[in-house]
A protein has these predicted regions:
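Classical eukaryotic N-terminal signal peptides for Sec-dependent ER targeting/secretion
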Residues: 1-9
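Extracellular glycan-interacting surfaces
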Residues: 11-14, 18-737
Length: 737
């Protein structure tokens, strides 16, 4: 975890970026998957935030995909696409606050991890123009709230035992609140050597009592929830943060996930769970604390055997005092559960409930028209309402409008008060249009069929026949939760292979084969059980599959059994020649290997990949046999003779993903797309002359996050077109402007 250091303000404008050696304007668009595709929850945090002063203003924050702003048509606009390789952790939005006094101001606590996975400290992003541009204050470490009576004051609750911090200048600088000494003791797994689960959760939330008196212009009463289990976890200051005490009489069994203040009632509502979220939760409670009589009341909406979850997302209806909602964390079967009360928690109604015959009465319709893959044909999953619900909000100006985040999308609707009628027939809609929070692992652009197919984390992947509409369904037969790699046969492009990453069920073959361009699939029968992941390559003529997995490199020809390939390590990069069906390639260290017998055996060529120790990607030309490129940690290398000799691309000192696309002129050199460092600039580049000259194609508004995570593919049918996959912002298509 990061040690505390001096707090230094550090400013970055979205419009500033290091100039590339040369640049070409590109038009970038999202390839629509729709529905979000990722977690919009909250660990112990709120993830969908409405502004209480400006009607219709709301933001959503995601764990790996940055920040979005709500539009009037229910769609969302991304606000942090500028994040580049140096600022990739800006996409980890750990907290968000929208100013209740000056709505144009918005603040984000950004950072990915507190262990070694993210070597950077956190930062506060601050905007005074609704997120169009940002300035940055670097933090020594990461929960964020704005004083409703003095909006220059911000409080920030940190992780890792770093305590409570305060700003009095709109977030430009922060100082530690030394009087707040309880920084949270809960650790998910102290034995986790990676540091991911062995860090202190820290401060969970900060909530102001907007009805309290002022001290020096600041709100006097402030509540802070801390990740303590078995001891006091809710603390209060009655003197604008000068001193703090534990709120007397509070429950101490569980962790406080959300703290929401209802001004009209002068009541603090708190949701609790026995786990930190977002996946866990087996017990929990909901309590309220009355300012008037300093009394805590247990208002948990489930008891006994009906209580098999904790509680996460929590919201109040500011238009209807006493109306609140809370989400189960987690009810995995048959569906997520949400509770609603109109009498301050005295009684509750449910989103669904069991009937006398053991079936389920659902009091909602399910509309996934904006993301039909959430409910594909033949869907038998009982989970319609979602899972992992940490972010739950009712629009403060509209009692019918509500939103909540799940592990896959944002749900909500515009008829919430129908819940309170005898019919209870609300419509639950996927309302995440514009949110593209997928982690993309593989992209291919075959020479025929759909221009793009994707391999995606958590939701499998898709055939993208239309970039403007959401796919009807993810891959099936089999459906893999995550697709780490794909390939197509260069001479028979309708033949496509993909792999899954979970070999725990040996009966599910982790290679799938399509012979109709991804329209239908079948498990590849020779695939051995228990193996998964790695990299995959299919021969140009489609009859041979080369698979690198944890057992090394194996090959199957004509649907025969997989056999080991000698001479290659399980670290080898692999690929097929896209024209010559007998040839496969491999690279390991600074050596390049070629097979001319359908992958049965490989021999190292005499050519060297310079001082490379880690080849990343091999890409072969769809139009020329033996024309192959290799990206490495020490540069980019090109061969036109099956790897017998290589030429190092000029000025390229490191390269990650590469892809080849249609040539500028018919019969000319393939366009080469590279995620690389060229002349000291790290970015996204294209060369039309075999790497002799380059143009940078990404710009200050499109950074695409961490370069090491992102696959790239040129389009062999459209000159200049490139597809970029990101780790949290989905897929982008780029064309010359």
């Amino acid at each position: 975890m990061h040690k505390l250091s001096t707090l230094v303000p550090f400013f970055i404008s979205v419009g500033l970026a290091q100039a590339a050696p040369s640049a070409q304007n590109y038009k970038w668009d999202s390839v629509k998957i729709g529905g979000g595709g990722g977690f919009v929850p909250g660990m112990i945090l709120q993830r969908i935030v409405f502004n209480t002063k400006e009607k219709g203003l709301a933001y959503a924050r995601t764990d790996i995909g940055g920040i979005y702003k709500l539009n009037s048509d229910d769609s969302w606009t991304p606000l942090t696409d500028f994040a580049d390789n140096q600022r990739w952790n800006y996409w980890g939005a750990d907290a968000l606050a929208t100013d209740p006094v000056e709505p144009k101001r918005v603040y984000v606590a950004a950072g990915m991890y507190t262990n070694s996975w993210d070597p950077n400290n956190g930062q506060i992003l601050r905007s005074s123009d609704y997120g169009k541009t940002w300035s940055v204050t670097k933090l020594p470490f990461k929960r964020l709230a704005i004083d409703p009576n003095n909006n220059a004051i911000l409080y920030f609750g940190a992780r890792s035992g770093n305590g409570l911090w305060k700003s009095t200048d709109y977030g430009v600088t922060f100082t530690k609140v030394s009087s707040f000494t309880n920084t949270g003791s809960f650790i998910v797994d102290p034995s986790d050597s990676s540091g991911y689960n062995s860090d202190k959760m820290g401060i969970a939330w900060v909530t102001f009592d907007s009805t309290a008196s002022k001290v020096g212009g600041a709100t006097s009463r402030i509540f802070v929830g801390v990740a303590n289990s078995g001891s006091n976890s809710v603390f209060v200051s009655n003197d604008a943060g000068s001193t703090w005490t534990a709120v007397a009489g509070q429950p101490t069994t569980y962790l406080p996930h959300k703290g929401v203040f209802s001004p009209s009632e002068k009541v603090l509502y708190v949701s609790y769970s026995d786990g930190s979220g977002p996946y866990d939760g087996a017990k929990g409670a909901v309590w309220k604390y009355s300012i008037a009589n300093s009394k805590w009341t247990d208002i948990t909406p489930a008891t006994g055997s009906d209580l098999y979850f904790g509680f996460g997302g929590l919201t109040v209806d500011l238009q209807k005092p006493g109306t609140l909602m809370v989400a189960a964390l987690n009810s995995w079967y048959p569906d997520a559960q949400i509770f609603r009360s109109r009498d301050s928690g005295a009684t509750w109604s449910k989103l669904w409930e069991y009937n006398s015959s053991g079936g389920v009465n659902r009091y909602f319709g399910w509309d996934t028209s904006l993301a039909p893959w959430l409910n594909p044909p033949g869907n038998t999953d009982t989970k319609h309402a979602g899972w992992m619900i940490e972010g739950l909000s009712i629009n403060p100006f509209d009692s019918n409008h509500w939103l909540y985040g799940t592990g896959a999308t944002i749900y909500g609707g515009h008829d919430l008060t129908k819940w309170d009628t005898s019919a209870r027939n609300i419509t639950l809609k996927s309302l995440a249009d514009g949110v593209e929070e997928t982690a993309v692992l593989a992209l291919i652009s075959p020479t025929s069929g759909a221009n793009l197919l994707s391999g995606v984390g958590d939701i499998g992947g898709f055939v993208h026949s239309n970039f403007k509409t959401s796919p009807r369904a993810a891959y099936t037969n089999p459906h893999y939760v995550t697709t780490p790699d794909m390939d197509y046969a260069g001479k028979k492009p309708a033949t496509i292979v993909r792999i899954g990453n979970d070999g725990s069920d040996a009966s599910i073959k982790q290679i799938a084969l399509s012979t109709d361009a991804g329209a239908t699939w079948a498990p590849y029968a020779p695939t051995p059980g228990g193996l998964a992941g790695g990299k995959i390559a299919v021969s140009a003529t489609g009859e041979t599959i080369l698979w690198r997995n944890s057992n090394g490199v194996t090959v199957s020809r004509n649907s025969g059994a997989f056999t080991s390939v000698s001479g290659l390590s399980s670290n080898s990069a692999i690929a097929s020649d896209k024209v010559n069906g007998t040839v496969f390639y491999a690279a390991d260290g600074n050596k390049f290997y070629v097979s001319t017998n359908f992958g049965s055996s490989f021999s190292a060529t005499s050519a060297s990949l310079g001082s490379s120790s880690s080849p990343v990607k091999i890409a072969s030309n769809t139009n020329k046999a033996g024309d192959v490129w290799v990206s490495t940690d020490k540069g980019l290398f090109h061969s036109t003779n099956y790897g017998a000799s290589f030429t190092a691309a000029k000025s390229v000192t490191q390269a990650w993903a590469i892809g080849l696309g249609a040539p500028k002129t018919s019969g000319g050199a393939a366009a080469v797309f590279a995620v690389a460092t060229i002349d000291g600039v790290t970015g996204y580049f294209r060369s039309d002359d075999e790497g002799n000259t380059w143009v940078q194609i990404n710009d200050a508004a499109h950074g695409f996050g961490a370069v090491s995570s992102n696959p790239i593919s040129g389009d062999p049918r459209v000159y200049g077109r490139v597809y970029v996959g990101t780790n949290g912002r989905g897929i982008f298509s780029g064309d010359i402007a």
